Amino acid sequence: MPGVYGATTCAVLAPHDLITGGTAYEFHGHTDVKELAMYIQDTITVRNWSFNLGIRGDLYNGLAIARQAEPRVGIAYNFKPTNTVFQVSYARTVETPFNENLVIASTGCSSPFLALLVPPLGVPCNLGPIVPGHCNEFHVGLQQAFGKYLVIDGEYIWKYTHNGYDFGVVGSTPITFPIEWTASKIPGYAVRLTVPNFHGLTAFVVMSGVAARFFLPQVAGLPIIPVGNEVFRIDHDEIFNQTTHLQYQPFKRGPWLSFNWRYDSGLVAGASPCSAPTATCFSSTPFADGGGANIPSGQVALVNTVSGLPLTADQEFQAGLTCNGKLAAPNPLGPALATCSAAGLASIYVQIPKPGTKNDDHNPQRIQPRNLFDIAVGHDNIFHGDRYKWSARLAVINLTDKEALYNFLSTFSGTHYVTPRAVTATVGFHF
């Protein structure tokens, strides 16, 4: 890439460019990881109180060494007059490094090839090896029964990790490796409402949300992001999702009808191109606007903002990217659009913040919200047999044939669409 990479960089990378007749790069590394865990735990019940007490000790020997005692305690109280259970718990845990390609992550900066290939342009490869961290995790919960027709379960979670782990990718390959951030804070909640059986009607509603916040700078592993002190979200983060399920069976031995509604506010889609002087938009934002892309001011480079590589036409098509109201890649076979005006960049499937509104922590790129509906009808014992039973079921998944993404260029799973409308008929014989 003339004007972007210098002669030294090209001299290191060119021998392994298979398009020009180069050879595959081979990495050889080895280490032994040994871990010993010892723990003791007991449950004590006193009237309406229940105590779960324990302590664990971990001895970790890998590329780094850690020794840590990990206390944990859980307390529950059953207030019988109102059928209420309160619970609270705390656990301290040692966070050991992921083993997948741990050697590459910890020693890769000593390889000139990896030190130039993986880090963003201009980011030095000088971080140390992955070391164990520790986590403080708190849970607060409530269970409330309203007679025999409604039960509510709720829980709130705080998880604070020092030296929080994530994964990076070697270029556009499927090779992943662990990385380490300064810290992470992951609060979240989960609520479930259940109607066991009310005159043939059963129902439940499950809802949850999680904030997966990670704190720069990266402190270990091959660098994958510019140096900074910001807070950003990874693609586990979703503000709200819920599933509502209703099933009605008017007669105990008769047919039933079910309905399912799923809503998702959208996962973070950090690989989507964007324009802002932030860590996650660095590779798609022009030099003049505080980024690292060699393009005119006011433009956006259509690149994977995690790897820095240009998006292919297929990837632009999958993301539903539009430029000034027109598809960036109408055909997944090409050609791909290289840049777009920052004001004109949008997407059918991804929420891309407009210029001046992007914030890695509070307004990141996200998958568009979606509603999905399923219905089913069936009979579990058509001929009312005792020993032998026949059943039948007809189900329609994604009733409205909604077209949407689950994620975009996720580190492990890539890009996935929701299942298109599908009709399934099943006949069963039970004996």
Model-derived regions: residue spans:
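Transmembrane beta-strands of outer-membrane beta-barrel proteins
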Residues: 51-53, 71, 84-88, 152-154, ...
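Transmembrane beta-barrel strands of outer-membrane/channel proteins
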Residues: 53-57, 75, 88-92, 101, ...
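C-terminal beta-signal and adjacent terminal beta-strands/loops
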Residues: 262-353, 367-372, 379-431
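Transmembrane beta-barrel architecture of outer-membrane proteins
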Residues: 30-38, 57-61, 65-71, 90-94, ...
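Membrane-embedded beta-barrel scaffold of Gram-negative outer-membrane proteins
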Residues: 78, 86, 115-180, 185, ...
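Gram-negative outer-membrane beta-barrel transporters
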Residues: 45-50, 156-161, 177-274, 340
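Short loop/turn motifs that connect adjacent beta-strands in outer-membrane beta-barrel proteins
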Residues: 45-48, 79-83, 149, 198-200, ...
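Signature of Gram-negative outer-membrane beta-barrel scaffolds
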Residues: 1-85, 96-97, 120
